């Protein structure tokens, strides 16, 4: 019978074992009768339960039953005493009926007990509460009988529930653990590792053990406290004493439970290891089967490199999706590898070879698949870079071709040089891009030539041949386009150089006009002196001749340049640019220079004739001092001088009717003054000569007169 089944009855406290003992060490059973009608059935149930608690040894020492009739009627007390005969006649050694203060009819009570004495089998005495100490020590009596023994009925009931629950659960758990451990031993011997043998206990062993330890600890603590207070009149024996709750039984259950639980833990460890190993095997095969199955099939179908950037990007996106699916399985591989490494570090020899085999198989498949993914990714990246370079080169070639096809009309040579520089830079960039395309194409071809077939069978020669042909086709097409552009660049370069020459000729022709104009300006403004004597004039004539030669060379150079522009324009098929104002300006300036030069030449020649004539008259040599000059010479000098002076006042008249003087008025006055001084000297010479001639005539006349006188005198 369990306390939980009769819990409401037990809580009524119809009877209880307080833990106290009589002088014979027999247990004291107390039946506290109350004023209310007591149910004999419930009392009998309570007594049956209580008498099942003590051990047989305790029962052999007999019970002392205290029937508290102070609050009850005699007939109820009598019924209870008679009932004891039917419930525990052999175990009862003494029944103490505690009488109330108002004593029952002595004759009746004595007669009844005496009458039933032989039939009852135990002694029944009537005693007042204060006389119980004659039979039982005060420390073994509870406080309602004047004793010092502490008893809490509800606490006792709760502890009984705990004890019985522990006993029930531990016994059941112990049986289950024994069965599980034995079954596990048999399954290991038969190598039977089916999941059906993985039986779990009905109760949590840790919880049951914890409950048992707490219960045992409390029992031991109660016994310790009770033994301390038992001899000093304090707290006496507790109802949770080992004789009532069988502390050794708890200890024995705990020991057995710990032993079987230790074995069960090993069983669980073996189960966990087997389960983990089986789970690892399952996951390994899942990874291997997927990688060698769907994963390999996905890679087998992806061998193209695309024919454009967009196609290559689409293939890369598809490959990323494949990689994403593989990544999930690679993550499982990493987790499995860690689990296998942990199991290997545990050092279980039994599964060591199997684990290593699984690890090796998993690693081989994963690394092989990862290398295929990486190879495919590298090929796609190289293909993308190849197509990117090809597109960039194609755009550069298109731009260069458009630039070459455009009809440009540069404004000057600097613009042409800039255009040529831009063309050269474009061509150089195209050459660099083509070289990069060749390098990337060759790298891609090398990658594809090193490509191997999958270990599960499919050669990839057909797919590779298409890819290789496409790469060669792209590179050859780009090479041809580049060659065509180079040819057109050569033609454009030649045309540009001719245009540079044209602009240069026009520029130099304009420069020749400017130089000729500068020479004319210099001739008019600086070539003014006519010389102070014939020698200086002769030098000026030589310089003038050279100056005219320079001007003639400049004019001829300008004419040649303008003729070259005509030829270049014919070659370039453009209108003759030199038919503008350059040639008229050149001719106009040259005519002006010719007129001016002739005038300068004429003036220098007149000055030379003047100085020569004057120098014949004016001689500084002493031998020629008395040399007489003809009158015609003087007249010639005077005529030349006046003509030269008149010439200085005459401007240079250009073909267009414009006029220009040599130098400034001051320059002309200076030149005229020099001529006049020379003429003055000649005039003085003439005067002196005339005086000399007059004196000579006078002397001759005097001589003639003298000669005429002498004959007369003689």
Curated annotation (Swiss-Prot):
Compositionally biased residues, Acidic residues: 696-707
InterPro entries listed in its UniProt record: CRAL-TRIO_dom, Spectrin/alpha-actinin, Spectrin_SESTD1
Record's keyword annotation contains Repeat: yes
Domain of life: Eukaryota
Keyword Repeat among record annotations: yes
UniProtKB keywords: Repeat
Spectrin repeats, residue ranges: 275-381, 384-497, 503-605
GO molecular function: phosphatidylinositol-3,4-bisphosphate binding; phosphatidylinositol-3,5-bisphosphate binding; phosphatidylinositol-3-phosphate binding; phosphatidylinositol-4,5-bisphosphate binding; phosphatidylinositol-4-phosphate binding; phosphatidylinositol-5-phosphate binding
Gene Ontology BP, a term: blood vessel morphogenesis
Region Disordered, annotated ranges: 691-714
CRAL-TRIO domain mapped to chain residues: 1-153
PANTHER family: SEC14 DOMAIN AND SPECTRIN REPEAT-CONTAINING PROTEIN 1
Function: May act as the primary docking protein directing membrane turnover and assembly of the transient receptor potential channels trpc4 and trpc5. Binds phospholipids.
Family to which this protein belongs: Belongs to the SOLO family.
Protein name per Swiss-Prot or TrEMBL: SEC14 domain and spectrin repeat-containing protein 1
Annotated source species: Danio rerio (Zebrafish)
């Amino acid at each position: 019978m369990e306390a939980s089944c009769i819990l409401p009855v037990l809580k009524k406290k119809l009877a209880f074992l307080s833990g106290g003992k009589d002088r014979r060490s027999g247990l004291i059973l107390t039946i506290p009768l109350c004023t209310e009608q007591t149910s004999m059935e419930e009392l009998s149930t309570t007594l049956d339960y209580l008498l099942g608690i003590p051990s047989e040894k305790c029962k052999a020492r007999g019970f002392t039953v205290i029937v508290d009739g102070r609050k009850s009627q005699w007939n109820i007390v009598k019924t209870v005493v008679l009932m004891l005969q039917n419930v525990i006649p052999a175990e009862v050694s003494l029944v103490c009926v505690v009488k109330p203060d108002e004593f029952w009819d002595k004759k009746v009570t004595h007669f009844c007990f005496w009458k039933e004495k032989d039939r009852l089998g135990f002694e029944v005495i009537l005693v007042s509460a204060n006389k119980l100490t004659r039979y039982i020590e005060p420390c073994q009596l509870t406080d309602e009988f004047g004793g010092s023994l502490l008893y809490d009925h509800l606490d006792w009931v709760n502890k009984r529930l705990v004890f019985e629950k522990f006993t029930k659960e531990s016994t059941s758990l112990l049986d289950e653990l024994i069965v599980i451990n034995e079954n596990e031993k048999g399954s290991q011997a038969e190598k039977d590792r089916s999941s059906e043998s993985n039986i779990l206990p009905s109760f949590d062993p840790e919880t049951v053990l914890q409950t048992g330890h707490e219960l045992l600890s409390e029992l031991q603590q109660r016994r310790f406290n009770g033994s301390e207070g038992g001899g000093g009149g304090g707290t006496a024996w507790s109802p949770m004493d080992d004789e009532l709750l069988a502390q050794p039984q708890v200890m024995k259950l705990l020991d057995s439970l710990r032993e079987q639980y230790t074995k069960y833990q090993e069983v669980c460890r073996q189960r966990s290891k087997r389960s983990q190993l089986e789970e690892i095997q399952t996951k390994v095969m899942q990874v291997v089967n997927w990688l060698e199955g769907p994963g390999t099939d996905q890679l087998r179908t992806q061998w193209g490199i695309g024919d454009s950037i967009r196609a290559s990007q689409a293939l890369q996106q598809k490959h990323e999706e494949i990689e994403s699916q593989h990544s999930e399985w690679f993550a499982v591989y990493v987790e499995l590898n860690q689990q296998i490494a942990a199991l290997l570090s545990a050092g279980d020899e039994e599964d060591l070879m199997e684990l290593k085999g699984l690890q090796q198989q998993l690693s081989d498949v994963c690394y092989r698949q990862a290398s295929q993914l990486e190879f495919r990714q590298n090929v796609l990246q190289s293909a993308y870079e190849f197509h990117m370079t090809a597109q960039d080169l194609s755009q550069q070639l298109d731009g260069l071709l458009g630039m070459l096809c455009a009809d440009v009309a540069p404004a000057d040579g600097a613009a042409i040089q800039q255009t040529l520089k831009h063309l050269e830079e474009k061509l150089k960039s195209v050459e660099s891009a083509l070289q990069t395309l060749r390098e990337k194409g060759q790298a891609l071809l090398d990658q594809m030539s090193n490509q191997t077939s999958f270990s599960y069978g499919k050669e990839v020669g057909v797919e590779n041949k298409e890819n290789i042909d496409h790469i060669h086709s792209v590179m050859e097409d780009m090479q041809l386009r580049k060659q065509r552009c180079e040819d057109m660049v050569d033609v454009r370069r030649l045309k540009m150089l001719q245009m540079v020459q044209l602009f240069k000729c026009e520029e130099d022709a304009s420069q020749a006009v400017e130089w000729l104009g500068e020479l004319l300006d210099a001739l008019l403004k600086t070539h003014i002196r006519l010389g102070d004597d014939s020698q200086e004039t002769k030098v000026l004539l030589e310089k003038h001749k050279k100056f005219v030669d320079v001007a003639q060379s400049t004019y001829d150079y300008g004419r040649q340049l303008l003729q070259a522009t005509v030829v270049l324009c014919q070659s370039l098929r453009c209108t003759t640019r030199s038919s503008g104002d350059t040639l008229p300006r050149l001719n106009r300036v040259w005519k002006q220079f010719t007129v001016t030069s002739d005038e300068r030449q004429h003036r220098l020649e007149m000055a030379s004739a003047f100085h020569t004539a004057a120098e014949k008259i004016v001689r500084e040599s002493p031998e020629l001092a008395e040399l007489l000059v003809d009158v015609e010479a003087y007249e010639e000098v005077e005529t030349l001088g006046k003509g030269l002076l008149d010439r200085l006042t005459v401007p240079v008249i250009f073909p267009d009717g414009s006029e220009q003087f040599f130098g400034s008025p001051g320059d002309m006055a200076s030149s005229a003054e020099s001529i006049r001084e020379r003429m003055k000297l000649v005039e003085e010479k003439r005067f002196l000569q005339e005086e000399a001639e007059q004196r000579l005539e006078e002397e001759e006349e005097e001589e003639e007169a003298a000669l005429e006188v002498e004959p007369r005198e003689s």
